[in-house]
């Protein structure tokens, strides 16, 4: 099975993908566990859930653990917004990128602060600014196109 298929199936039933381990015998194993109420959701998983709902694949169990899925619920925190606005070219390029890309990339930066990883936060913020000034999108943000047109 493909990783994305496993993640989507888990989301449909209110589960979340956790740690994965590599093994010579089995290749890769992925731990799946029931999602706790009020658990943290990445913007990427929120978009996956929106897609699964639209396709009629989300079960009642999956619906029970959903967070606020409105795109407006996502906010860019002030330090990140300041870093993006510092150079007008960065801010202009950033605003030309798709909304989903913006949310997924910024969430990846901001999540490091939530989990008390300041070095990782600084590294990710620097990478976002560097790639944005070059007008480059990077990383897995649309599940190879699955999340673009559904």
Predicted features and spans:
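Charge-dense, helix-prone N-terminal extensions
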Residues: 1-150
